[in-house]
Amino acid sequence: MSALPLLLLGAPEKAESWCRSWRASLPACRVLVLLAATDTAAVPGISAAGTSPESRRVTAAADAELLVLGPTVALPHALPPLPAGVSPALISQVVLQGLGLHPIVVDLGCPVAPAVSHLRLPPPAGAGPARCLSTGSAMDRTRVEALLEQGRRWGRAAARSAPSAGPVPLVLAECVPGGTTTAQAVLTGLGIESGGIVSGSLHRPAHALKADLVARGLAAAAARTLVPAGARRLPPDPVAVLAALGDPMQALAAGLLLAAAETGQSVLLAGGSQMAAVLALALALLTPELRPRLAALAAIGTTAWVAFESDSDLTLLLRRIGRHWGIDHPLAFAASLRFRGALHPALQDYERGYVKEGVGAGGLAILWELAGRSPEHLAQACDAACHELIGPPCAPPACHLVAPGSGDPLRSGDG
């Protein structure tokens, strides 16, 4: 039996079966990268996916360009500066290039479109950034329903075009600055206690600020009767919760999971807290009969920096999600990739608790392992790519190469 990626949660025999199916069909898997935006990202102190609210407006576009074009090309949009580290899109790009996989980028209404080939949904599905979750009216219900249906249609179409062996596996990745906060809001609205255990791109997750925004959003939504005031006691309407507190990525991704449960498509949810919220939404929307099937088909794949972060607890969060909807523990894996040793300082920042995850980095690093490649080799390849992207490290005081005409260091992040 081949070695498994590090299993965080789930039965070992289910994990082995899931990994075996992925190894067999890995070259044919589809990688879907969902870009979305929420005005929640403009709240000061909520995200490190750019050092200012204005810089976070371009994060998704710049990360998608790095993902597609690679580190040796001048990017059309400079990567926004980070407090520390380098964009997780760098890790994802190295994996995709090494495994010969080509991502499909979908723009769900970002303020800045990526200057690479991508799909951009028209309104209402792609109607710009979601409003701040504190308004309790993040998206119109018609938009949420359109995104859910679009996800279902894509999933069903993929199944119809699949070979006789069944639908090819799907990797779902995201880039949504502010998305861990909308994740916490949606989880709370669905009745999952998530305060203090949701991660984020900041060195220390802004738990108090997240909790305040979530409380304000729930109160505003209850005042509009979008989410029942007793949501923790009565089963809430998941579509209403999404409309009140969520972001476009969550809706489209949940629709894809609904189709996967119907068609039998295996899905790797490449991320941490944000993908946990997507899984919770799909479970809430499914009939009780289909929930165990989805739990067997879908797995969370994240980085070790999220999995073992002292200020969050993804495993506990997933246990609560499973218990809430009466399923066995959801499958969850952590990549073995670490950036210890003589690597670029921007990568070593991950070991200090910065950036941690985004743009599918953890899940794609797990694919690397399933392909039989070593995490040490991946770390070396990321080091080489980082030198290509931002140049060799400078002697103290730290300095960074600057994109011509931008004044911004070539860095970016997510969440």
Residue ranges and their predicted role:
Residues 1-173, 177-415:
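N-terminal loops that bind phosphate or other acidic moieties
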